[in-house]
């Protein structure tokens, strides 16, 4: 009976310690509020972002959200997804109600959201991605992600500050690290891809790619009334000057994706430490987005890329 009692106490303590991932923040932006919603199902990752009557996120499985992830080479040839800590959870979590990722902390008040998450590996130890075996030996990684999301930063209502810190643990060896600071999976109605030249202040049509470039990307509806883009004062990464902003169209899955990616490469090994990045996610009409990028660019100080 004593053993049973201890078991019940342990279970109760575990349940008491569980952190809810259900939250919502909001703030006025033009004719509407920007509303951001997280869920426990996704371990605090962003499930929904709405503005002016439209959903901007095509949330499905545990990969298609507004979220963060990382990829590493484990000291061998770099193969995407084979060592891939992911905020929202694992591929095996699918469309189910739970996440392999563990949410350690969440606060949401007014227009500010903060979370701390222990990321799951995208693949299970015995799984493969495009024929390539997982390099991780556990389902849950020791990689931590902290994020702070603020709607309406710097007095700009259409700008969402997206600050992330990836903690790379000790006792791992990597020569190459790829940090997807933020990615957005969007409904196919955001079918028009754009890039924005900040120097010339010029909006340019962008091909489907897929791939990355050094200029920020924006997706919009055909009527330009709804758009989402991303820009970071820290781009591009040192040594990767032609990359940083990706765009992808997945016809079969009926989803489009953009991302903001940073890279670290060191022949003797990527240091076990915190890696922090600041991005801005822009939401509104296409004009709102380009006007906001211009305003941010004018007031954001340059990032020292030798410090992290």
Where do the PLM segments sit?
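Active-site/ligand-binding surface loops and adjacent short beta/alpha elements
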Residues: 181-184, 189-251
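Bacterial N-terminal signal peptides
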Residues: 5-14
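Generic recognition of long tandem-repeat/solenoid scaffolds
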Residues: 24-29, 36-37, 46-48, 111-118, ...
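Extended, loop-rich substrate-binding clefts of extracytoplasmic carbohydrate-active enzymes
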Residues: 74-157, 171
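Acidic (Asp/Glu-rich), glycine- and aromatic
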Residues: 50, 156-199
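Beta-strand-rich N-terminal accessory domains
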Residues: 17-103, 278-286, 290-302
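Beta-strand-rich recognition/accessory modules
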Residues: 18-32, 37-39, 224-308
């Amino acid at each position: 009976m004593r053993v049973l009692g201890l078991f019940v106490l342990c279970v109760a303590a575990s349940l008491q310690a569980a952190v809810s991932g259900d939250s919502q923040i909001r703030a006025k932006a033009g004719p509407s509020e920007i509303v951001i919603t997280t869920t426990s199902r996704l371990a605090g990752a962003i499930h929904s972002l709405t503005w002016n009557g439209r959903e901007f996120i095509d949330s499905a499985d545990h990969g298609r959200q507004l979220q963060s992830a990382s990829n590493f080479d484990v000291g061998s040839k770099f193969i995407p997804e084979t060592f891939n800590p992911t905020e929202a959870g694992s591929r095996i979590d699918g469309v189910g109600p739970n996440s392999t990722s563990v949410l350690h902390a969440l606060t949401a008040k007014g227009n500010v959201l903060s979370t701390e998450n222990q990321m799951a590996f995208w693949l299970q130890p015995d799984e493969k991605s495009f024929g390539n075996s997982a390099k991780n030996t556990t389902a849950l990684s020791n990689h931590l992600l902290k994020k702070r999301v603020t709607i309406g930063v710097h007095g700009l209502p259409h700008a969402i500050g997206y600050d992330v810190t990836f903690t790379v643990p000790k006792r791992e060896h990597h020569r190459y690290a790829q940090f997807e600071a933020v990615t957005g999976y969007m409904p196919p109605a955001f079918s028009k891809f754009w890039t924005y030249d900040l120097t010339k202040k010029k909006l340019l049509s962008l091909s489907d790619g897929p791939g990355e470039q050094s200029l920020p990307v924006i997706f919009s509806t055909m009527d330009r009334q709804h758009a989402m883009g991303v820009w970071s004062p820290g781009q591009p990464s040192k040594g990767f000057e032609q990359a940083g902003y990706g765009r992808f169209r997945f016809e079969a899955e009926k989803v489009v994706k953009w991302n903001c990616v940073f890279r670290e490469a060191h022949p003797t090994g990527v240091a076990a430490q915190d890696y922090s990045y600041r991005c801005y996610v822009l939401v509104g009409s296409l004009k709102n987005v380009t006007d906001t990028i211009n305003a941010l660019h004018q007031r954001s100080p340059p990032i020292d890329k030798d410090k992290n």
